[in-house]
Curated annotation (Swiss-Prot):
Entry's Gene Ontology cellular component terms: viral envelope; viral outer capsid
Role description: The VP7 protein is one of the five proteins (with VP1, VP3, VP4, and VP6) which form the inner capsid of the virus.
Name under which the protein is recorded: Core protein VP7
Entry's localization field: Virion
Pfam families in UniProt: Orbi_VP7
Presence of the UniProt keyword Coiled coil in the record: no
Coiled coil: none
GN (gene name): Segment-7
Residues bearing carbohydrate: N287
Gene Ontology terms, MF aspect: host cell surface receptor binding; structural molecule activity
Assembly and interaction partners: Homotrimer that assemble in a complex of 260 capsomers on an inner scaffold composed of VP3.
GO biological process: fusion of virus membrane with host plasma membrane
Protein keywords: Capsid protein, Glycoprotein, Outer capsid protein, Virion
Length: 349
């Protein structure tokens, strides 16, 4: 299936080079399009030309690219347009070994297949405590009953520890059971002035320490912590104290947008509004997948089919921009011109 996807990507990118009718095509583009169009026309009985000039010819070439995108992604889109019917035989065209594919396309498909079939340490973009159900007011003293040191979450990436005079305690428990981190990068600081429960202000005296595995760590410096070693806070002074511990970032095996080069840009290209026809087409294709149909996914996609579909659909979007096809979509009304941000915004409502 990797070679089928690589051929589809190669042919669509070759079609995206047809910026004007009399352009001098590169030799590899002529070879790719010549073989692909010949095989496609023979199996589907369409009339795609290598140099589309009229609207009908541009539509035919775009429909060929649409067929190839859907076949490579394994999508049966169904009846979406009175002007277009999906040709299931296109998979046979893409399976033809005579159609060459570029090194770039093959490498990209190999990266998608390789990265989605395994896991690796990745820097996570969200706060470590993002999914906590409660939070406490920053800089305000809080002590639980029968404790001398209390750690609480005070933000999506931060905790604070309240300590009685002369108290000490381990606070690693508040990190455990969350996000399955491989490494957490912390910075701790003294809260110079904090509010007691009665509202009066109090100062944290110098001498408060935070240690990892028994080794004192300097305040204001990034600490690499595995989440398992004892994270110990100590207040040797004769007054109450508070410290702040911030998670700068953490690494886990969860997939991110860095698993594939330019995945963020590909997602933006797919979900961008070009006109109502493209908006309806993208939505119809997305409805046959597990990805959102109108707005980008909340969390990074982590399976091969989703990322491959995004890559193929982003390339189809480029072809749509170049060929400027015009065809009807079921349930889609023509858009007013000129295109404005307000018109584009309204399409997502």
């Amino acid at each position: 299936m990797d070679t089928i996807a690589a051929r589809a990507l190669t042919v669509m990118r070759a079609c995206a080079t047809l910026q004007e009718a009399r352009i001098v095509l590169e030799a590899n583009v002529m070879e790719i399009l010549g073989i692909a169009i010949n095989r496609y026309n023979g199996l589907t009985l369409r009339g795609v030309t290598m140099r589309p000039t009229s609207l009908a010819q541009r539509n035919e070439m775009f429909f060929m690219c649409l067929d190839m995108m859907l076949s490579a992604a394994g999508i049966n889109v169904g009846p979406i347009s009175p002007d277009y019917t999906q040709h299931m035989a296109t998979i046979g065209v893409l399976a033809t070994p005579e159609i060459p594919f570029t090194t770039e396309a093959a490498n990209e498909i190999a990266r998608v297949t390789g990265e989605t079939s395994t896991w690796g340490p990745a820097r996570q973009p969200y706060g470590f405590f993002l999914e906590t159900e409660e939070t406490f007011q920053p800089g305000r003293w809080f002590m639980r009953a029968a404790q001398a040191a209390t750690a609480v979450v005070c933000g999506p990436d931060m905790i604070q520890v309240s300590l009685n005079a002369g108290a000490r305690g381990d606070v690693q428990q508040i990190f455990q059971g969350r996000n399955d981190p491989m490494m957490i990068y912390l910075v701790w600081r003294r809260i110079e002035n904090f509010a007691m429960a009665q509202g009066n202000s109090q100062q944290t005296q110098a001498g408060v320490t935070v240690s990892v595995g028994g080794v004192d760590m300097r305040a204001g410096r990034i600490i690499a912590w595995d989440g398992q070693a004892a994270l110990h806070v100590r207040n040797p002074t004769q007054q109450n104290a508070m410290v702040q511990i911030q998670v700068v970032f953490y690494i886990s095996m969860d997939k991110t947008l860095n698993q594939y080069p330019a995945l963020t840009a590909e997602i933006f290209n797919v979900y961008s509004f070009r006109d109502h026809t493209w908006h309806g087409l993208r939505t119809a294709i997305r409805n046959r997948t597990t990805l959102p149909n109108m707005l980008p996914p909340i969390f990074p996609p982590n399976d091969r089919d989703s990322i491959l579909t995004l890559l193929l659909l982003s390339t189809l979007a480029d072809v749509y921009t170049v060929l400027r096809p015009e065809f009807a979509m079921h349930g889609v009304n023509p858009m007013p011109w000129p295109l404005t941000a307000a018109i584009a915004r309204a399409a997502y409502v």
